[in-house]
Amino acid sequence: MKEFNWPVRVYYEDTDAGGVVFYANYLKFFERARTEMLRSVGFEQDNLLAEQNLIFVVRSVKVDYLKPARFNELLDVSAKVIEHKKTNFTFEQSIIRQQNVLCTAEIRIACLDAQSMKPKLIPSAILEHLN
């Protein structure tokens, strides 16, 4: 799959006392883009849990904060699978405001059995859509 993009508006609740986006909230923006990426190819995470006892969890995160985002700005959040193995994906993600890169991340997502919390094979149907 090509790079997926999702618009995010910065709300007051996303900012800190200095009026800039609180650093942890960038992770929420990245999460929304990955969720919407899955949704765009027909996979709802609640259905994956109910039907296949499958969940996705963050395994590791590497983030570089380059420039601040501020209240009421419209941002573009991207997500692209750059590597996949049998039980995990690695996403390359960025947050951009008018061609200015504000934040980049490499996020590894593991596929787990929801009950045992042990690694589970990523369904082939998902891999077909995200590669």
Functional labels for PLM-detected ranges:
Residues 4, 39, 70-72, 82-131:
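HotDog/MaoC-like acyl-thioester-processing domains
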